[in-house]
């Protein structure tokens, strides 16, 4: 627009100033002096974009083609260019969101896309009124508000517009100066200003001038490029050192504050040709140009706000100072000022209407006012000496009339009274401020804001605005709060005037003459303070002197107010009182009687403090705001009015904001939180704050049902996650769920912030949660040090805060779908075994039903109400108005075999209905249809956190209890409830009975069943109350329990109904979703019911912790658990999670790990010949997830289905929960369905093109798609599909033979029984694992083969597959070993193809070929890594190595020996392999994590058929990585570099995180010692679980991941170990120990950390000599786990 020729500008000017003014007025905004809309090109086009950016855009649009700066591609439109250059960014495939053109790094892809508009010049959003274009819709809409105001009511709307304008200016950054100019957003401010609109001649060429050196440029780009040379020259005022964003702001500041005009090199005024000066007078639109006063107004305004003439016809420029005026009269008036200055007289400037002036004078005299022009201005630029205050006060004392009662009331000395008056604004108006209400104070005219706040609007520095000011004054007086009445004016006219001004706080009559004694400090140069004094201010000359003299004028005022309101004394008296007792009364702020009083005080204060300061600042030139806000131009004159806080150095643009701010200082805000000491500035802020206490999240996304406390967050969520672009779509998808005020009140008053253990009132629920960790961390059993309660399911990294863990997952585990992140945060740090019960007893005793625990309020007491519902213990009566479902403690089955009914919790929270104990009772539980209960997505699918925590505590305690714990976890019901409370992944509670060793395998299974039925992971209030929950930090920290927030996925929102069958699915789904991190699945997998007794413990733990996943996995806990329990005490372990929890139990974190580990542990436990990893859907899924191999995943899912059927048919072998789930429905279906369950309610469903998975967010699908990127070729995919199916059968078969045998071998006769009972489910799972793993391995081999073939092509994929395959192979081997150990193990594997190297047989040739390739790679990798790894395991480790090079060598060594050795060796390997394999698996998982790191778990079936987007390729093995960091870590697997060394055991690690995690093993070991052998075993299991978790989590990507990868590999190995180890545990214990010891002197512990695998157990048994010394905990935990497995 600037480009428009001067002619156009002229034309617009020709239209005459009137036209211009009218056009300007249509803008409806008054820009303060600074707002200089660019010259209006033409009235018709008033709002041309005045930004250089816009001009650029327009110039660009004029071009016929646009060239890409990167590839020179020619685009015909800017939009094409935008879309094209955006592609350059996506090509990098990185996650750093950096611009490929300028390298700028942005926070998100959307920000980067928006940023690209800068380079393309496209401004897609255009104002329909004025045509201005914007890069963002928000900016355009903000701009549109300019036009929303009535064009004719520009004056009226002026005040609001400044705000917007200002915001615009500050927010929108246009090209350098243009930005500030834009701040005068008057649409009329065309780009003319940018062009030399002043130089009409030059304008013809549209020349751009550098505002610093005035160099000319023909295009904006040239100017912008040139401006970069001045980037280091800050725009700073040489006089007052204030900095400005734009040159224009600096010019305006100098002209207004320092009266310095820009000058050219010759020293002559340089305004009209200065491109930095805004062109045009449209900013004068704030007043009617037809008004008689317009000449004077425009003269005064133009003297302060420099403008350039746009029209040659209408050029009214002063020859002396080069200032331009819109009309001749204005110029004439202005010239008089020069004449007067020359004469040295400051004669009043001739007013167009002298008569009016006289009238005004008389009127003002009556008011005790006088024109500033009549008062000889005292230089105000020199700051007043501090004693000025005293002087001023003294003068006031002398000159200001005192109200008779004023001083007398408090017997204040006149001086005091004066000071009081000064300090009080609206109160007895400051005598000072009243001393002169010269109009000038209105130099910034007072504008009465709608809120009755007074805004000082600097109008002109040199002339006063008489009428407007008076009107404002009157208005202000009228608006003054009635309470603040002024004493009669001493010199005021009689009653009438007094009556008028009675309420006008500040206007107290003063002598007409300015006090001679007053020294102006920062008054505007032209005025003396007296003149400046504005209505409510003390003389500006006293900065915040009142503060110094008195407690603070504001405070005094507030006190006075308080006194006033309280004592009813005259405001003045009150004021004095307050002043006298300075801060004494401030504390009584709350005592302020009414908000009115507060408001009036604040108003008084605001005007007073803010005005005093404003004037000082404005006059002084500390108008930072003015200068700062070039937007001021856009804003009406009042725009420049800044409101500085009297108590601090903050400056506000609006009096309302200042008022609210002052309240915060005075503490008189009526909006105070009744729970904590928070004082809100306004009601909305208080409401938002209260939600932090109530946990209310009223705004719910209708698509995914995620709740938000603030609507803006929900809107952003819809835009980013659901791609809702339009306001209509967004509004349509936001649901507001209001909760009754009573609920909120109750919530706020509820004792949800009081610690039930120590009675401390934490004020905030969040603080309580954090505080509870101190109790949870104290292990009552003395076992746990205060551990960080939140653990990453993927890498077992521990965090003190959940948000930190979530952040970690977002950053490190990119494969984890956002919707599943909650499930990856494990509340690992439950109370110690003893601790949990104790804590629960104290916290949840009532609910738990444990008499001992009964003393304490249920945990629910700690829980904040969700959506206004309080979580209360059953014993606590809900507030009368809050309808809460009370769940009697009895409602929770004391029988630990009975699962807790979490659905009730959900009900309680949701007010579904009050249900009686029957719900909780097992019988009622079964009848209870979980399917009717919504799945609470807000509760992590793995209730593992809580479950594991619960399990852990109970387990820790239950080592003794475990015998009886199965059915009755412990004598104390509380622990039991905690166990039952533990939910399976499916949300089913895992009953503590699981912990019982072999003693009660079946009963635990039943509880599992019960919990499984409770597929809905909802903690009932009772559950919440249950001591275990309380005790477990997991619960406390558990989002579900602790979060008072509106149910994240609102509990109210029904999730897909979960029937008994569904629960398994739900469980599976949850498991899968949680398994999205393979670790979860692994853990969720049934732990091989290794040793019955040990297994029982482990299983119990697992059952608790792992059970959760298992439960989730196991739709029918009964079926799953029963077989497990009956066959093996580890039946609970059959839930991988449950098993894992056992391991976790000791550490508490093991729960999480246990989960993942649980999967592996279960496989170990199921050493009965079934490779848990390869057996059962869960194992398969776990592996799939761990390996993140889409192919494998799909097969596993299918296998799960097949296994479900097959398992049902051949259930005997697999007695794990998976079988139940499988029985319930095909594991795959269940997994998928479970996964789907999470989003069933989502309105938006995006289906994965490669698999059945559905995602609510595009980002989730995107992430998930990565799981398909590593998948094998289509053939492989087909093979994978076949594998999946075959895997199922294999799993079934394998588990039957291998699993059973393994179990037998492992001493899991009970497990066999359990397997037989749960054969279908568990057998399926074990088969699924064993077979699945073998088939998987076969498939993996085939896939591997395919991948191997394609591996070269897709090294990353292949390696992932290979790793997966290797893992599967290891599992296979383990399974085979198990099979060998248990005759059925190998036989059950219907492997028609046998591996020449390891003798393993595979169903699919592809699997076999991949398996062989794995061997082939293994050797090299082993050589690379440790050279010790056998070919078979080596390959797995190798991938892991690649992913986690540091640990790879050891892992490779471990796994290699297992893999490479002969079948006998193989068994040893398998046994050891689990450890090594685990490391390999971990590595593999890690690699996969790297490879598939994002959604790898997301797509169960989809085979990766997409091109690998990982751009970083390993030059050695061609493996691909997402980031250079991952590649660097991976290279360590080739270089053998292990830069991190454990100081305790000298073990070295590739990744720092691995070292950190490893060191935790030592810490845990110490804890484990406290907990006892079982605890140690559990702990080690936990570690393994952690490792698995870590690796399974596909954490290879991060160092943590990498480090975890070895651990994960170990876990994987362990899983395999579990599989193999179950069979080989006894056989290969020695081998494994030897190998692990040899291969991983220090890793053994980790490798063995997966004690869940029988092999691991065996190994641990054997290893104790070498490894246990190094890792006592590992040894202990592993030993325990192994013992369990061995049993």
Swiss-Prot record:
Biased composition (Acidic residues): 1343-1355
Covalent cross-link (Glycyl lysine isopeptide (Lys-Gly) (interchain with G-Cter in SUMO2)), residues: 203, 435, 502, 551, 566, 593, 613, 615, 624, 857, 885, 913
Polar residues bias: start-end ranges: 1093-1104, 1192-1202
Record-listed Phosphoserine modification sites: 36, 42, 161, 175, 180, 231, 970, 1122, 1134-1135, 1140, 1167, 1174-1175, 1219, 1225, 1320, 1475, 1585, 1598, 1653
Subunit description: Interacts with NEUROD1. Interacts with AR.
Protein name (database record): Ras-responsive element-binding protein 1
Underlying gene: RREB1
Signal sequence bounds: none
Function: Transcription factor that binds specifically to the RAS-responsive elements (RRE) of gene promoters. Represses the angiotensinogen gene. Negatively regulates the transcriptional activity of AR. Potentiates the transcriptional activity of NEUROD1. Promotes brown adipocyte differentiation. May be involved in Ras/Raf-mediated cell differentiation by enhancing calcitonin expression.
Keywords carried by this UniProt record: Activator, DNA-binding, Isopeptide bond, Metal-binding, Nucleus, Phosphoprotein, Repeat, Repressor, Transcription, Transcription regulation, Ubl conjugation, Zinc, Zinc-finger
A single Gene Ontology CC term: extracellular exosome
Family stated for the protein in its record: Belongs to the krueppel C2H2-type zinc-finger protein family.
Tissue: Expressed in heart, placenta, lung, liver, skeletal muscle, kidney and pancreas. Not found in the brain.
MF-aspect GO terms: DNA-binding transcription activator activity, RNA polymerase II-specific; RNA polymerase II cis-regulatory region sequence-specific DNA binding; RNA polymerase II transcription regulatory region sequence-specific DNA binding; zinc ion binding
Residues recorded as bearing Phosphothreonine in the entry: 1315
Cross-link Glycyl lysine isopeptide (Lys-Gly) (interchain with G-Cter in SUMO1) per UniProt, renumbered positions: 615
Gene3D superfamilies membership: Classic Zinc Finger
Single Gene Ontology BP annotation: negative regulation of transcription by RNA polymerase II
Zinc finger (C2H2-type): 66-88, 97-119, 125-147, 208-230, 235-258, 316-338, 643-665, 671-693, 699-722, 753-775, 790-815, 1246-1268, 1393-1415, 1512-1534, 1540-1562
Bridged cysteine pairs (disulfide): none
Biased amino acid composition, Basic and acidic residues: 175-197, 944-961, 1322-1342, 1416-1426, 1480-1499
Comp. bias regions, Basic residues: 163-174, 1150-1163, 1558-1572
Extent of Low complexity compositional bias: 1111-1124, 1134-1143, 1449-1462
């Amino acid at each position: 627009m600037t480009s428009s020729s001067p002619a156009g500008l002229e034309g617009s000017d020709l239209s005459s100033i009137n036209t211009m003014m009218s056009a300007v007025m249509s803008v409806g905004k008054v820009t303060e002096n600074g707002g200089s809309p660019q010259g209006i090109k033409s009235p018709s086009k008033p709002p041309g974009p005045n930004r250089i950016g816009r001009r650029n855009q327009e110039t660009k649009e004029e071009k016929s083609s646009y060239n890409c700066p990167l590839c020179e591609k020619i685009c015909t439109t800017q939009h094409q260019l935008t879309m094209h250059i955006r592609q350059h960014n996506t090509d990098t495939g990185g996650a750093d969101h950096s611009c490929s053109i300028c390298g700028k790094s942005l926070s998100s892809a959307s920000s980067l896309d928006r940023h690209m508009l800068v380079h393309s010049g496209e401004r897609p959003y255009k104002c329909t009124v004025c045509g201005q274009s914007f890069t963002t819709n928000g900016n355009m809409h903000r701009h549109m508000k300019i036009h929303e105001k009535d064009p004719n009511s520009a004056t009226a709307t002026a005040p609001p517009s400044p705000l917007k304008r200002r915001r615009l200016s500050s927010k929108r950054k246009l090209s350098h100066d243009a930005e500030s100019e834009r701040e005068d957003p008057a649409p009329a401010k065309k780009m003319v200003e940018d062009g030399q609109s002043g130089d009409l001649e030059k304008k013809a060429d549209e020349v751009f001038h550098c505002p610093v050196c005035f160099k000319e440029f023909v295009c904006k780009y040239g100017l912008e490029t040139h401006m970069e040379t001045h980037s280091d020259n800050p725009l700073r005022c040489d006089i007052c050192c204030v900095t400005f964003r734009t040159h224009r702001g600096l010019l305006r500041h100098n002209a207004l504050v320092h009266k310095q005009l820009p000058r050219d090199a010759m020293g002559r005024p340089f305004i009209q040709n200065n491109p930095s000066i805004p062109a045009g007078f449209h900013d004068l639109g704030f007043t009617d140009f037809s008004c008689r006063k317009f000449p004077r107004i425009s003269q005064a305004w133009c003297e302060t706000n420099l403008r350039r003439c746009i029209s040659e016809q209408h050029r009214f420029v002063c020859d002396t100072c080069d200032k331009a005026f819109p009309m001749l009269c204005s110029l004439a008036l202005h010239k008089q000022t020069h004449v007067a200055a020359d004469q040295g007289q400051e004669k009043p400037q001739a007013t167009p209407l002298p008569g009016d002036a006289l009238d005004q004078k008389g009127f003002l005299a009556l008011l005790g006012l006088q024109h500033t022009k009549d008062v000889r201005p005292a230089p105000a630029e020199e700051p007043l000496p501090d004693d000025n205050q005293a002087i001023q006060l003294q003068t006031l004392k002398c000159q200001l009339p005192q109200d008779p009662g004023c001083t007398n009331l408090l017997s204040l000395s006149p001086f005091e009274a004066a000071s009081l008056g000064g300090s009080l604004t609206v109160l007895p108006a400051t005598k000072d401020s009243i001393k002169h209400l010269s109009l000038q104070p209105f130099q910034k005219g007072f504008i009465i804001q709608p809120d009755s706040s007074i805004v000082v609007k600097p109008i002109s520095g040199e002339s006063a605005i008489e009428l407007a000011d008076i009107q404002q004054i009157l208005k202000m007086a009228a608006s003054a709060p009635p309470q603040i009445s002024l004493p009669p004016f001493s010199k005021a006219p009689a009653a009438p005037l007094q009556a008028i001004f009675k309420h006008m706080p500040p206007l107290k009559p003063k002598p007409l003459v300015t006090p001679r004694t007053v020294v102006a400090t920062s008054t505007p140069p032209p005025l003396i303070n007296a003149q400046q004094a504005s209505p409510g201010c003390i003389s500006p000359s006293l900065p915040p002197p009142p503060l110094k003299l008195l407690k603070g004028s504001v405070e005094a005022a507030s006190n006075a107010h308080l006194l006033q309101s309280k004592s009813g004394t005259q405001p003045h008296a009150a004021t004095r009182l307050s002043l006298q007792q300075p801060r004494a009364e401030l504390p009584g702020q709350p005592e302020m009687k009414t908000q009115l009083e507060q408001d009036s005080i604040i108003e008084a204060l605001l005007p007073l403090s803010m005005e005093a300061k404003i004037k000082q600042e404005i006059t002084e030139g500390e108008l930072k705001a003015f200068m700062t806000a070039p937007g001021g131009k856009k804003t009406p004159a009042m725009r420049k009015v800044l409101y500085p806080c009297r108590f601090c150095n903050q400056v506000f643009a609006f009096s309302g904001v200042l008022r609210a701010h002052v309240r915060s200082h005075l503490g008189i805000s009526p909006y105070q939180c009744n729970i904590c000491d928070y004082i809100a500035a306004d009601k909305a802020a208080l409401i938002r704050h209260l939600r932090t206490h109530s946990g209310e999240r009223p705004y719910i996304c209708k698509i995914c049902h995620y709740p938000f406390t603030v609507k803006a967050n929900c809107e952003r969520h819809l835009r980013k996650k659901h791609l809702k672009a339009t306001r209509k779509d967004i509004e349509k998808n936001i649901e507001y769920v209001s909760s009754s005020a009573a609920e909120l009140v109750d919530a706020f008053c509820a004792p949800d912030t009081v610690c039930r253990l120590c009675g401390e009132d934490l004020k905030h629920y969040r603080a309580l949660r954090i505080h509870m960790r101190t109790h949870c961390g104290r292990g009552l059993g003395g076992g746990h040090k205060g551990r960080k309660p939140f653990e990453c399911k993927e890498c077992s990294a521990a965090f003190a805060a959940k948000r930190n863990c979530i952040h970690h997952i977002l950053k490190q585990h990119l494969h984890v779908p956002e919707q599943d992140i909650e499930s990856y945060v494990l509340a690992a740090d439950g109370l110690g075994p003893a601790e949990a019960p104790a804590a629960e007893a104290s916290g949840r005793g009532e609910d738990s039903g444990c008499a001992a625990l009964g003393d304490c309020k249920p945990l629910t007491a700690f829980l904040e109400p969700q959506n206004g519902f309080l979580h209360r213990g059953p014993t606590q009566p809900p507030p009368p108005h809050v309808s809460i479902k009370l769940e009697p403690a009895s409602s929770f089955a004391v029988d630990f075999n009975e699962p807790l009914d979490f659905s009730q919790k959900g009900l309680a929270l949701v007010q579904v209905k009050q249900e009686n104990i029957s719900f909780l009772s097992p019988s009622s539980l079964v009848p209870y249809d979980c399917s009717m209960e919504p799945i609470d997505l807000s509760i992590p699918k793995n209730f593992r956190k809580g479950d594991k925590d619960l399990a852990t505590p109970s387990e820790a305690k239950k080592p003794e209890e475990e015998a009886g714990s199965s059915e009755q976890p412990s004598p104390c019901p509380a622990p039991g409830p905690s166990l039952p409370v533990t939910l399976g992944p499916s949300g089913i509670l895992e009953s503590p009975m699981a912990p019982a060793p072999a003693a009660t395998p079946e009963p635990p299974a039943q509880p599992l069943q019960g919990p499984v039925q409770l597929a809905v992971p909802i903690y009932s209030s009772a559950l919440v109350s249950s001591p275990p929950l309380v005790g477990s930090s997991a619960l406390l920290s558990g989002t579900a329990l602790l979060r008072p927030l509106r149910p994240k996925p609102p509990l109210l929102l029904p999730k897909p109904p979960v029937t008994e069958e569904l629960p398994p699915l739900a469980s599976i789904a949850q498991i899968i979703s949680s398994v999205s991190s393979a670790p979860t699945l692994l853990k969720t997998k049934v732990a091989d019911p290794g040793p019955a007794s040990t297994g029982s413990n482990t299983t119990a733990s697992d059952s608790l912790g792992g059970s959760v996943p298992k439960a989730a996995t196991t739709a029918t806990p009964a079926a799953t658990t029963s077989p497990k329990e009956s066959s093996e005490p580890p039946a609970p372990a059959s839930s991988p999670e449950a098993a894992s929890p056992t391991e976790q139990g000791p550490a508490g974190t093991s729960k999480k790990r246990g989960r993942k580990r649980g999967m592996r542990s279960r496989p170990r436990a199921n050493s009965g010949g079934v490779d848990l990893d390869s057996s059962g859907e869960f194992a398969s899924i776990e592996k799939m997830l761990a390996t993140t191999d889409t192919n494998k995943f799909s097969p596993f899912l299918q296998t799960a289905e097949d296994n479900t059927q097959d398992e049902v048919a051949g259930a005997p072998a697999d007695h794990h929960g998976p079988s139940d789930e499988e029985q319930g429905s095909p594991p795959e279906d269940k997994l998928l369905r479970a996964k789907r369950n999470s989003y069933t309610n989502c309105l938006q469903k995006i289906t994965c093109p490669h698999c059945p998975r559905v995602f609510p967010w595009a980002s989730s699908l995107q992430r998930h798609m990565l799981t398909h990127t590593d998948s094998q070729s289509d053939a492989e995919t087909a093979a994978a599909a076949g594998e999946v199916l075959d895997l199922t059968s294999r799993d079934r078969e394998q588990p039957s033979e291998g699993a059973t045998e393994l179990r037998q071998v492992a001493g899991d006769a009970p497990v066999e029984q359990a397997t037989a009972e749960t054969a279908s489910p568990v057998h399926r799972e074990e088969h699924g694992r064993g077979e699945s793993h073998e088939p998987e391995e076969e498939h993996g081999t085939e896939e591997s083969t395919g991948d191997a073939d394609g591996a070269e092509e897709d090294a990353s994929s292949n390696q992932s597959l290979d790793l997966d395959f290797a893992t599967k192979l290891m599992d296979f081997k383990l399974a085979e070993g198990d099979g060998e150990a248990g005759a059925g193990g190998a036989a059950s594997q219907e492997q028609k193809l046998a591996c020449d190297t390891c003798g393993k047989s595979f169903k699919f040739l592809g699997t076999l070929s991949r398996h062989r390739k794995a061997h082939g790679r293994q050797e090299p990798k082993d050589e690379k890594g440790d050279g010790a790894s056998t070919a078979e395991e080596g390959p797995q480790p190798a991938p892991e190595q690649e992913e986690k090079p540091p640990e790879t060598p050891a892992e490779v060594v471990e796994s290699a020996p297992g893999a490479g050795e002969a079948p006998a060796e193989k068994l040893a390997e398998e046994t050891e392999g689990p450890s090594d394999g685990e490391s390999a698996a971990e590595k593999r998982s890690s690699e996969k994590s790297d490879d598939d790191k994002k959604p790898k778990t997301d797509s169960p079936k989809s085979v990766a058929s997409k091109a690998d987007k990982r751009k970083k390729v390993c030059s050695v093995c061609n493996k691909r990585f997402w980031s250079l960091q991952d590649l660097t870590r991976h290279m360590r697997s080739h270089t053998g570099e292990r830069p991190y060394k454990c100081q305790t055991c000298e073990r070295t690690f590739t990744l720092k995180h691995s070292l950190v995690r490893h060191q935790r093993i030592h810490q845990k070991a110490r804890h484990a010692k406290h907990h006892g052998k079982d605890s140690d075993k559990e702990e080690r299991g936990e570690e393994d679980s952690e490792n698995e978790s870590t690796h399974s989590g596909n954490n290879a990507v991060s160092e943590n991941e990498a480090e975890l990868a070895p651990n994960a590999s170990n876990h994987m190995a362990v899983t395999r170990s579990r599989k193999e180890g179950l069979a080989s545990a006894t056989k290969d214990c020695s081998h494994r120990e030897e190998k692990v010891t040899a291969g991983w002197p220090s890793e053994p512990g980790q490798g063995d950390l997966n004690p869940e695998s029988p092999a691991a157990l065996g190994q641990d048994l054997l290893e104790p000599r070498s490894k246990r010394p190094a890792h006592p905990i590992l040894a202990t935990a592993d030993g325990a786990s192994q013992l369990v497995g061995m049993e």
